[in-house]
């Protein structure tokens, strides 16, 4: 989901993962502290920093709780975050979230020990439940050409990461919030329907595009887990429909990804439903689940209790891999 408050709440969830405080001393004679070590294993406590390089270019600074300017990823690590999520666009305006930008951020994250989730949108801009726009360079493709484009793009980006020495790719999303599939062709006529990856019109195409991405991921990072990601984690029917269609058409995935964006007046019910759905879906489809996105207006006094409930609840479910 395109979160217009994304820049403002970049660190909100990370604060809930904090495991130690930070301190400083003005005593010049103080004994230097040993370099701190960080446990980056286990339950994924993640943050999406896809906007980071553009924010830095615009002069945005980040500060720790003592008011000291700190590089963003280092600050996230200090606060207990152990995983980073990065979105990939095909040919974005300005290059932000394109291949080279993703490589630069992934390399920085790996140097700090972060595990990585790479999130392919298969679009030149935001892909979400209302927008799954075919990249400009892929317009007019047949279904076979579209499938090949998915495979080539996925393999190209991941190979570039691997060639750079990035080895910490643990998860790869094939599509972003694909409630009704991806790579939509909404023109009229049979030709459009033969190409679209909209599940309600051509579920077989969606499964084929997902599988093209899945196989490309495994060709580069065999151990990486492939995520199919859907919004509204509180809505069980949305998931059983989508994954039912995907399964029926031979689609492949390793992990189910969820988004959840509750509000002040509904977060108690939505979070309870989401936690229950994690258990139901992991049992029904024999796979793990991960919260790929979660958020709430940062200024709400309900944001912290909502996040605490979800972090604690997800940790208590053995089939939930983490929360971003």
Set out the residue ranges of the language-model regions.
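Bacterial Sec-dependent N-terminal signal peptides
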Residues: 15-38
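Boundary/entry segment of secreted carbohydrate-active catalytic domains
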Residues: 35-72
């Amino acid at each position: 989901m395109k979160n217009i408050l994304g820049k403002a709440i970049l660190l909100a969830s990370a604060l809930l993962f904090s495991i130690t405080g930070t301190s400083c001393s003005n005593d010049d004679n103080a004994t230097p502290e040993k370099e701190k070590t960080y446990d980056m294993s286990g339950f994924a406590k993640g943050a999406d920093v896809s906007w980071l390089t553009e924010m830095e270019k615009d002069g945005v600074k980040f500060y720790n709780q003592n008011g000291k300017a700190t590089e963003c990823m280092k600050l996230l690590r200090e606060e207990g975050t152990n995983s980073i999520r990065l979105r990939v666009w095909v040919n974005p305006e300005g290059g932000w979230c394109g291949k080279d930008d993703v490589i630069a951020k992934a390399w920085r994250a790996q140097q700090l020990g972060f595990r990585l989730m790479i999130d392919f949108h298969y679009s030149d801009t935001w892909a979400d439940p209302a927008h799954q726009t075919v990249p400009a360079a892929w317009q007019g493709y047949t279904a076979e050409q579209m499938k090949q484009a998915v495979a080539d793009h996925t393999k190209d980006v991941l190979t570039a990461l691997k060639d750079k020495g990035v080895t910490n790719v643990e998860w790869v999303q094939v599509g972003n919030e694909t409630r009704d599939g991806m790579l939509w062709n909404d023109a009229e006529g049979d030709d459009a329907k033969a190409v679209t990856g909209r599940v309600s019109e051509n579920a077989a195409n969606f499964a084929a595009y997902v599988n093209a991405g899945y196989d490309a991921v495994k060709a580069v990072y065999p151990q990486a887990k492939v995520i199919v990601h859907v919004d509204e984690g509180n809505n069980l029917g949305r998931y059983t429909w989508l994954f039912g269609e995907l399964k029926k058409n031979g689609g492949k995935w390793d992990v189910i990804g969820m988004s959840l964006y509750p509000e002040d007046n509904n977060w108690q019910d939505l979070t309870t439903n989401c936690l229950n759905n994690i258990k139901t879906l992991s049992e029904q489809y024999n796979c793990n689940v991960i919260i790929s996105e979660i958020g709430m207006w940062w200024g709400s006094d309900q944001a912290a209790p909502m996040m605490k409930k979800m972090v604690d609840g997800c940790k208590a479910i053995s089939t939930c891999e983490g929360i971003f």
